[in-house]
Amino acid sequence: MTWEYSEDNLIEQTAIDLFFHQLGWDTLLAYNKEGFGDGSTLGRLNKKEVVLKKIFFEKIKEFNPGLPQKAYQEAYEKIMEESITKSLAEINFEKYQLLRNGIPVDFIDEKGEQVKNKTLKVFDFDNAENNNFLAVRQLWIQGKSNRERRPDIIGFVNGIPLLFIELKAAHRKLENAYNDNFTDYKDVIPKLFHYNAFVLLSNGIESRIGSITGKYQHFHEWKRITEEDEGIVALDRIILGVCEKNRFLDLFENFILFDNSLGKVVKLIARNHQFIGVNKAIENIQHKEQLYKLGKITLEEKQKLGVFWHTQGSGKSYSMVFFCQKIHHKFTGSYTFLVVTDRNELDTQIYGTFSGVGAVPQVKAGAKDSLKASSGKHLRELLGSEHRYLFTLIHKFNFEEEITKRNNIIVISDEAHRTQGGQLAMNLRNALPNASFIGFTGTPLFKDDEITKRIFGDYVSRYDFKRSVDDGGSVPLYNENRGEYLGLKNPIINEQIRAVIDAESEDLDSDQRSRVEQLFAREYPILTSKKRLDAIAKDAVWHFCNR
């Protein structure tokens, strides 16, 4: 059977139809049809080129008009630079920084003056339709040792290959797309993945998205476009959910992180619920700003940014980072985010998340340049300066005076329901009277939890345990009444214990005797006896080995 009439091609055609008819991407079939040269359809000179140079120059000149050709050429050369000493993930990180933040170039302007570090933007993130979206099928790429590979679909934006899609027929395991194709392509044509933002795998029934560093189990489904949607695992849902032009650019610009906390670069892409939840929280801020300017809500109402309830284990700390970094990137004004926790381990864990992805420096608590408050005095000093991020325990608010009237401070309270009713929480609000508050929690609020609602407002995003289990992010916990049961083998045990107590406690007064009887009556020594614990351990091992 030829490729044109294969089952793989049928699902590929379905996917490309979605790109063209529903998403408005340009599409092209390159299989046995591509020419080469400046005047060719894609403008490639040979199969080794993975950046579409012709489109790249068209868009970068459009977005950065009036510059000498040397400036555009330098931008292209910088984006094409290669390194033989860096890993694929490190190269991908460097390319991402250039593509997202712009490419710095030096040139002589029309007045003959030297211009240094002029940043040329590659994408128009504010108006998606100003960009060139092109999905190309079956494009031959030549890589190591002149070996060639032909990916199913490559998605180019302004000539940059940001999207890689590998498709399989419905009867084939999706994991094969990862093991047999994706990993092979990374090895043979790594240059394609220098620029890659997203990897999509699908067999028409299962569909997953991941990054170039992700293992297969870290690829996740994209089942919803809005939080209210019922989750559907389908090819059209993941393509529409991820590749709609505005969502695609938003996901690229604001929902990619690179974590270097373990000594090697790991690329992280927001999961479906994080993308939806963070955007809902940010839309709520924008909505309240508009209402406040129109005089429809009070300042107190504007300061209540809502409760972000995403169940434990759903990546809440990373959601905080996405939330903060999108506001820093898209909002005007120098915001300070104050992350407040009530436990040392949470404080350390959240700071570790922020520092691991480069949002804050990796410095020890107590160091001169630390952004973690080590005392109430240190906290006052930190709040007196304009930092992007600060971290503290609620207990450091051991003072009552006002520190600043700044209205561009957002307090992020982790496990918001636990510590909002006491004196320390009151001190926090007195110190920052114009701050806004958002609560992050992994625990649902009780209906009568009026204190938390009074401070933060209602839910702004909800991702509960059941939905997390359905999405494969959490494992259900079942209780099976099994194991080592307690039973009475000696019917006269009570009389024997009484006899021992009577024989050994003649010199005890009534209170001491009562205390001895209470100790013998406790279940703990029986429940934790070595013989019983050994039996429980053996049963647990048997259960997990045979389930």
How would you label these PLM feature ranges?
Residues 311-312, 417-418, 431-448, 472:
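Conserved helicase ATPase motor motifs in RecA-like P-loop NTPase domains
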Residues 372-390, 402-406:
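Conserved motor-coupling elements within RecA-like helicase/translocase cores
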Residues 450-547:
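Interdomain helical connector at the RecA1-RecA2 junction of SF1/SF2 helicase-like NTPases
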Residues 346, 396, 415-419, 445-446:
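Residues immediately C-terminal
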Residues 404-438:
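SF2 helicase catalytic motif II
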Residues 2-336, 345, 349-361, 386-389, ...:
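ATP-dependent helicase/translocase motor core
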Residues 139, 344, 366-377, 393-399:
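Conserved helicase motor
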